[in-house]
Amino acid sequence: MPARPAQLPPFLVCLAALAPAMAQSAPPRDRVVLVDGKELRGRVVHEDANEVLLRVGTTDKAIARKLVREVHAVAAHHRELLQQWRGSSPEDPVAMLRLARQADEQGLPHEARLFRWYALLQRPDDVELHNALGNRRAGKQWLVALGDKRVPFDRADAMGVDFAAAWRLRSEHFDLRCAAGLRTTLDTLLELEGQYHAFHAAYGDAVRLLELCEPIPVHVYRDRAQMPQQSGAIGAYYKPDEATLFTCCENGRAYALAHEATHALLHHTFGRALRAKGELPAWLDEAWAEHFAGRLQTRVPGKPVLLDRSVQPAHRTTLAQIAADELLTVQRVLNLQQGDFQASTGQASKYAQAWALFTFLCEHDDAAIRATFVDYLRQAAAGKGQSSTFRKLFAPHERLLPDAWR
């Protein structure tokens, strides 16, 4: 349950279904072939059984699925590539090069470079790989670019003591600077991409999620001491005003990555990309991040697995230890502000109850309750997430809400 930095403004989010036509500009990397043979170019940002949403410039055009014969989309290729990655070992250079070639063929140049870097870690003297990655030979050494300098490949990781010399690599949806070494950089990028697709799989059926067309900046520091100063010993946070995720490396992994990546995805997918009009309530902001983090099993670096339900044992333990007369009421949870989550007093119980309420409504066995919660999400994203909206929507189910704490 990572703390958020003090005095950060709450970010704005808007569900795609409520978004204006103007959106993030996207290069025309995709093709949609109609049944009459006409071919349209743009970026496929969403498709389902009923329609294909094609972004041309900054305008999203809905095309009825019955009019579409073929769709050639980067998003689909990226999902396929990530599936292949899940079954491959990063210690197998042959497998990594096979993935790199697949990425090349499918128009995913950033991923192609990532897999070649994985291969190079196993074959550090491979001339062809060094040349493909743009490294330069200097005598018997190979020099790689770190910031505005070139340093020997075998000493590059050690340069991370200075964040200015951090590795900087791209993936389809993320732009990462990492001072914790090349392998951690690669694993973190693939972890983030896995989380991106898991986020869409987890919530895409209920909330219309569009493809992200702008990379999210992420900074991973060598340790907490290297991080920019914030109030308290904060190990991870997302800053909406900089549209950047900040975290550090702990035990070889990026700390609280899923929680903060959720904040980043919400902001970039809805607020930043679609010029949001509504403010997501603080309880929902944090609860959503905790719910998604609980739905990920992250045992293998770079390969998160999406679970059917959100699992947060620490929150369950916290709830079990709170006396009944000390539990916050549903009304109080709905009225929690960002500062309430930042305060150390009762912090664990606030996160636990927010997560429990989200989980109770999102995963309820009653389809009507789940549908009502989706309705609330849409209204909250449109700037109508006040507790009065929640109470009105859930009035028929009010007596059931305290069951969330059980």
Model-inferred region functions:
Residues 1-6:
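N-terminal secretory signal peptides that target proteins for export/translocation
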Residues 9-19:
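Bacterial N-terminal signal peptides
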Residues 23-171, 175, 182-203, 208:
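Compositionally biased alpha-helical segments
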Residues 51, 65, 97-100, 113-116, ...:
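Extracytoplasmic/secreted envelope proteins and their assembly/folding machinery
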Residues 72, 103-107, 123, 178, ...:
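Sec/Tat-exported extracytoplasmic proteins
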Residues 72-75, 162, 229-245, 252, ...:
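Acidic/His/Gly-enriched intrinsically disordered linker/tail segments
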Residues 90, 94, 106, 110, ...:
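Soluble non-cytosolic domains of exported or imported proteins
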Residues 163-281, 382-392:
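Juxtacatalytic substrate-recognition/specificity segment
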